[in-house]
Amino acid sequence: MDIALAIKALILGIVEGLTEFLPISSTGHLILAGQLLDFNDEKGKIFEIVIQFGAILAVCWEFRHKIIDVIKGLPNDPRQQRFAINVIVATIPAITLALIFGKAIKAHLFNPIVVASAFILGGFVILWAEWRERHRGETHDPRANALLEAAKAGAPRIETLDDLRISDAIKVGFAQCFALIPGTSRSGSTIIGGLLFGLSRKVATEFSFFLAIPVIFGATVYELYKSRALLSADDLSIFAVGFVAAFISAFFCVRWLLKFIATHDFRGFAWYRIIFGIIVLATAYTHLIAWQA
């Protein structure tokens, strides 16, 4: 095994695992890291699919009991049937647009300038969404009981995954479509979209995790099938390094995020996106780093 290549695979696997489920865009980070490490050829793109699969398996393991309950309940449990339907209908919009526009998006938008711009814009959207969330319960009606009105208006409408309606799932599904733009963040689009549509922070985050399973699994199977002619046995060791690194880092990241959202909002991630995006644009326009278009 080429040690230098293995180190690159390890770094990219960790980057994928740490960014896939945070609202900071794993695709954007992989595009930038891939260019910095000179690991962005056709094999590198296949490698990205493999490590994304490693990350999604970490989510499957973390939520294995819920997944098993859904599978067991599909024949006769209305709650599990409704949950499965919600995941399916929320997945359809993004998959449909990806099939129609996927090639054009990869050809024209997968570059550092677009990624950095999406980082910055997405950061401001998160700040706005969090501001809206904090002020959700405010009322300016002097005739109303302020405390009562704030309690009614400020509480999220959906506190558990079982409360999620098909209409809510469809809205989150359309929000996920924004993630087709690299640098936007699939988890960021679905979590922030969920908050705006009345989901609690916990429900929005967990539903985002579950939405990732069919989306990333489907993309993995599709891309590996398309690129099967480029794969060889020599790639297995490098792919395995990245896969394991992505699985382990994603597993700990998911557990950390579930604890984090209990007491924190996403403003820190928003400022990270904005600052990082500005740095990337600055390095591009000053030619400090020769980013590829």
From Swiss-Prot:
Disulfide bonds: none
GO CC, any one term: plasma membrane
EC category: hydrolase
Keywords assigned by UniProt, alphabetized: Antibiotic resistance, Cell inner membrane, Cell membrane, Cell shape, Cell wall biogenesis/degradation, Hydrolase, Membrane, Peptidoglycan synthesis, Transmembrane, Transmembrane helix
GO biological process, one term: regulation of cell shape
Membrane topology: Multi-pass membrane protein
Annotated GO MF terms: undecaprenyl-diphosphatase activity
Primary subcellular site in the record, as a coarse category: membrane
Transmembrane segments annotated in the record for this chain: 3-23, 43-63, 85-105, 109-129, 203-223, 238-258, 269-289
Range of residues in the leader sequence: none
Cellular localisation: Cell inner membrane
InterPro entries registered for this protein in UniProt: UppP
Catalytic activity: di-trans,octa-cis-undecaprenyl diphosphate + H2O = di-trans,octa-cis-undecaprenyl phosphate + phosphate + H(+)
EC number, UniProt record: 3.6.1.27
Source domain of life: Bacteria
NCBIfam families the record matches: PRK00281.1-2, PRK00281.1-4, undec_PP_bacA
Biological role stated in the UniProt entry: Catalyzes the dephosphorylation of undecaprenyl diphosphate (UPP). Confers resistance to bacitracin.
Family: Belongs to the UppP family.
UniProt miscellaneous comment: Bacitracin is thought to be involved in the inhibition of peptidoglycan synthesis by sequestering undecaprenyl diphosphate, thereby reducing the pool of lipid carrier available.
PANTHER family in the record: UNDECAPRENYL-DIPHOSPHATASE (PTHR30622:SF3)
Stated name of the protein: Undecaprenyl-diphosphatase
Organism from which the protein derives: Ralstonia pickettii (strain 12J)
Gene transcribed to yield this protein: uppP
